Structure formats: structure tokens, C-alpha cells
Amino acid sequence: MTQQNKYVLYLGLADKDTKQQRITTSKAMAIVNQVVGDCTITKSKGYWQGFKENTLAIEILFSTLEQVKNYCEQLKTIFNQECIAIQEIQLNQALLV
């Protein structure tokens, strides 16, 4: 096992200007998969500035912080988001093949 970081992105799906969800959750998941590639996506509810919205928690392994920041910039533009939260977790991980 090697020590690496896992990143979890929290992507709200409500447009920052209209406060309405423009893209369906299933379509949003497909877009995230196109941008990020290998990841685990979990549907959840989140709150931003007191506003409840559908949120995707996106878990990413075996990537660098720079790659993750690049994904966030792309996703911010696509989903018209003010920000995307990034959680960085140090852990031991390996792929068993």
C-alpha cells in the first residue's frame, strides 16, 4: 500500500445566478464522469448560504491536487457554480488486481 491523497469534491447543482437546477442529476453525473473520468459519485443534499440543493459528492483516488483543481475549474464553468468544496484526505491505498 502507498500513502496518497483522496479528494472529495462537493458540487452543488443549483445555478449560482438563478438558484435553480438547470441540469438533471443523472445528466450531471454523466458530465462529471466525462470531465473527471475514474471516480465515485454519490447523490446527496447540500446547503450553500442557507439554500438547499441537490449535490454530488465526487471521490477521486490516484490524482494530484493540480488535476483536481483543473477538474473543479471545468465543473464550475459547466454548472455555473460560485465554488466547489475540495476535501483532501491522506490515506493508504492500493489497487488489488
Predicted feature descriptions by range:
Residues M1-V97:
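Positively charged, small/polar-rich N-terminal and surface patches that mediate targeting and assembly
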